[in-house]
């Protein structure tokens, strides 16, 4: 089997980190990047220096010309095209396109990439109509005739594996999720206008900001047996990366907190290895920066009121973990061909 050739549309936080994951993978080849809003030389700077994940040190990065980046000896074609259907992915050899602009998140808009020669599109955000897949949870439902998929959200990727383990072992009656979530690019540095979400317009680094999230309801899309049983909300907090899910659920089959811990530990060492983590150390958020797993269960942080009512805590690097799953989903699609 040859390498999996990918292109990235939108060189923002997720786009750049997916590029980092791809460039460190033996089986994946980054062949093209499209972003109409930044020049190629600025692209090299933004890729090389990262406040959260540190400087890129795996290969030299240089400008070959205005349309080509060099990662070591590896050339990557650069486009600056606004309209997705005009991006010549086929010419660049990109078969799988990561749609990470945050703009083209529905099937019709994402399908524009197919016109330029892409074979499959992975949307790095939730989608209202593209099928959503969470690696470790429902990627086995993917069939090769599906050309446009969503990798759901970073929070759904954290919550769904945890919810799956609990539901498979103990049965979830109902639950509420809160994610304590790091700042993201859409927030404001100082108080500013945000017509749809007034609180969201307040200064990100000075406030704890309650916000809505569809992440818990989306679990019902990837695990239909939990449809209508979970909902949740978010607090945006003044940290720059790493978030944490608090899942409070009622369970059918009574179990002690120790038994619940055992079930999660077994999953983290077995079927969900590399997706679900398990820690018993006294860790804090920065300890999870750069963790490639989707969901790291904090055994010491959770509590049980009784054998049927429990609160579970699970960490995630909402940037790096998620970007790794985007590439994992592409790998799975490639194998399914």
UniProtKB/Swiss-Prot annotation:
GO terms for molecular function: glyceraldehyde-3-phosphate dehydrogenase (NAD+) (phosphorylating) activity; NAD+ binding; NADP binding; phosphate ion binding. It holds the Pfam family Gp_dh_C. One of its GO terms (cellular component) is protein-containing complex. It is found in: Cytoplasm. One of its GO terms (biological process) is glucose metabolic process. Keywords: Cytoplasm, Glycolysis, NAD, Oxidoreductase. It catalyses: D-glyceraldehyde 3-phosphate + phosphate + NAD(+) = (2R)-3-phospho-glyceroyl phosphate + NADH + H(+). This is Glyceraldehyde-3-phosphate dehydrogenase 2, cytosolic. The lineage of its organism: Eukaryota, Viridiplantae, Streptophyta, Embryophyta, Tracheophyta.
């Amino acid at each position: 089997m040859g390498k999996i050739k990918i292109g990235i549309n939108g060189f923002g936080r997720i786009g750049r980190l997916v590029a980092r994951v791809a460039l460190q993978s033996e089986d994946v080849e980054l062949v093209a990047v499209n972003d109409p809003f930044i020049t190629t030389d600025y692209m090299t700077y933004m890729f090389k220096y990262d406040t959260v994940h540190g400087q890129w040190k795996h290969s030299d990065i240089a400008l070959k010309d205005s349309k080509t980046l060099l990662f070591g000896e590896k050339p990557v074609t650069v486009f600056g095209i606004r309209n997705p259907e005009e991006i010549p992915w086929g010419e660049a050899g990109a078969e799988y396109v990561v749609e990470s602009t945050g703009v083209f998140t529905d099937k019709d808009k994402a399908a524009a990439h197919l016109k330029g020669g892409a074979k499959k599109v992975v949307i790095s955000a939730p989608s209202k109509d593209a099928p959503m897949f969470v690696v470790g949870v429902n990627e086995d439902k993917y069939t090769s005739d599906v050309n446009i998929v969503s990798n759901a959200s970073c929070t759904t990727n954290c919550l769904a594996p945890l919810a799956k383990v609990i539901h498979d072992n103990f049965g979830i009656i109902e639950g509420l999720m809160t994610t304590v979530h790091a700042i993201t690019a859409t927030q404001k540095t100082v108080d500013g206008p945000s017509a749809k979400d007034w609180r969201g317009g307040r200064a990100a680094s000075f406030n704890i900001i309650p916000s809505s999230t569809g992440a818990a309801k989306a679990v019902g899309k990837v695990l239909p047996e939990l449809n209508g049983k979970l909902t949740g909300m978010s607090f945006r907090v003044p940290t720059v990366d790493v978030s944490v899910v608090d899942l409070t659920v009622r369970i059918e089959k009574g179990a002690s907190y120790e038994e619940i811990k055992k079930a999660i530990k077994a999953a983290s060492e077995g079927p969900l290895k590399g997706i679900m983590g398990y820690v018993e150390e006294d860790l804090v958020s920065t300890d999870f920066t750069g963790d490639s797993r989707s969901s790291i269960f904090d055994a010491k942080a959770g509590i049980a009121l009784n054998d049927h009512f429990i609160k579970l805590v699970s960490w995630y690097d909402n940037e790096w973990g998620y970007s790794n799953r985007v590439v994992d989903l592409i790998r799975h699609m490639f194998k399914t061909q």
